[in-house]
């Protein structure tokens, strides 16, 4: 490993430091951070997608009802629960599309004109869970993400917002929603992914896009 000697710095005269020149080069370009290595560890989507595909008839029905691509729904099922309708996360996200009753579940209830929030048993019901997941994607697309023009960029924005919230995504562009959407529309899909990898506070955000592409390729 190369050695660098620091001189002219108080307290560091003659100090010899070993550095990884590859990491230094990366840092000079964009910052040396493992946060950007969102493809590791590799994710094999084959089995999760196979399990998620068994729910495709429901996904197609929900997609038609809410104007959401059923393949996107299937990909989210594969990523979120691996096709397990009884999955419950540590943060109490429930079911095939891992919905939280108090957040996304409540938002869907409000869209439907209902009070309260869905029960655990309701969220474990495959048809109800997928229907509410599709409804939530519609809420994101027609609400905070409205105005995104590129279909692929919109797809990426949807899954990042689904996983980590639309506000967190938009704030990486601007605190003003309209300005954020305008900046997003200046990017193609690859540029959007690069922006998310470099600027989103959640390391899992770019990895979700990576998993989305793996899942879509496995269908």
From Swiss-Prot:
Keywords for the protein's UniProt record, in alphabetical order: Cell wall biogenesis/degradation, Lyase
Gene3D superfamilies noted in UniProt: 1.10.530.10
GO cellular component, one term: cell outer membrane
Gene Ontology molecular function, alphabetical: lytic endotransglycosylase activity
GO biological process: one example: cell wall macromolecule catabolic process
Superkingdom of origin organism: Bacteria
EC number: 4.2.2.n2
Family of the protein in this entry: Belongs to the transglycosylase Slt family.
Function in brief: Murein-degrading enzyme. May play a role in recycling of muropeptides during cell elongation and/or cell division (Potential).
Protein name: Endo-type membrane-bound lytic murein transglycosylase A-like protein
Gene that encodes the chain: emtA2
